[in-house]
Amino acid sequence: MAAMVDAKPAASVQGTPLLATATLPVFTRGIYSTKRITLETSSPSSPPPPKPLIIVTPAGKGTFNVILFLHGTSLSNKSYSKIFDHIASHGFIVVAPQLYTSIPPPSATNELNSAAEVAEWLPQGLQQNLPENTEANVSLVAVMGHSRGGQTAFALSLRYGFGAVIGLDPVAGTSKTTGLDPSILSFDSFDFSIPVTVIGTGLGGVARCITACAPEGANHEEFFNRCKNSSRAHFVATDYGHMDILDDNPSDVKSWALSKYFCKNGNESRDPMRRCVSGIVVAFLKDFFYGDAEDFRQILKDPSFAPIKLDSVEYIDASSMLTTTHVKV
């Protein structure tokens, strides 16, 4: 998998923008219809996938970049269908393995190894399972993960040459001192320079049960701060919680229960949160994969274009060390 193109500079901005009067196209559904494909490890394809997979792909003719998505703690990959569909409708192929189903989850090292098997399967196994005239560009793959899957995504990026990494409220344990293995937050700086976007939640650090689902010291801020060699963006969805990117009512009973009762959730509809997260992901990858920076730079310049409130928006361009910042007021 090839490295990213060079990042583009951004001007330094501080303060709070005026309220946007219109949304951006990345926050609404894209031009492509989508097709969902389910693969089991018993699939007749050669080689079969090492883990069960959901693939959501644009249904149209073309060549599309790939996103490897890693689910959150003990959640079903089926619980993210709205986000997958939104992203795929903008011209990306989402590959989402079911790494495990158990509660408690396996060791983080075992989870990482399972994700690595799927990453290694992509170049040989993905294309033959796509619709006719739909081609996957596996030379430029982004890895994205939610919750504990975010930790796995960053750990996988230390091992493989992904084109970009995206963390959706990533979590590395219950605290900095009780982190998951491999303990990547023990590093002062991650040993990669690929572009990064981290999206955190304002309520992820608020406990609902025994502990917060995205506790301070092991959450999105820690991941962002360690990407010192990367062009990197950070967004915080102020009024939403750790599970608010999931479908409203996940079909898997376990995921439904975890989604509704385990973490502190926001009081508003999840739909704007999902559209915001999906839109940021699309805008980020359009910028760094295709050189189409307009939407991503507009969000950084004026976060009120997003369908939800975003605080602590920050972008650091590694090539120039210029910073775009919107501080919380």
From Swiss-Prot:
Its main location: plastid. Optimum pH is 7.5. Active from pH 5.0 to 9.0. Induction: Low constitutive expression during fruit development and no marked increase towards the later stages of maturation. Strongly induced after 24 hours of exogenous ethylene treatment and increased further up to 7 days. Gibberellin-A3 (GA3) and the cytokinin N6-benzyladenine (BA) inhibit this induction by ethylene. It catalyses: a chlorophyll + H2O = a chlorophyllide + phytol + H(+). Keywords: Chlorophyll catabolism, Chloroplast, Hydrolase, Plastid, Transit peptide. InterPro entries: AB_hydrolase_fold, Chlorophyllase, Chlorophyllase-like. It is found in: Plastid, Chloroplast. GO terms for biological process: chlorophyll catabolic process. GO terms for molecular function: chlorophyllase activity. It is an enzyme of class 3 (hydrolase). Pfam families: Chlorophyllase (PF07224). The active site is at 147 (nucleophile), 169 (charge relay system), 242 (charge relay system). Optimum temperature is 45 degrees Celsius. Active from 30 to 60 degrees Celsius. GO terms for cellular component: chloroplast. Residues 1-21 form a transit peptide. This is Chlorophyllase-1, chloroplastic. The gene is CHLASE1.
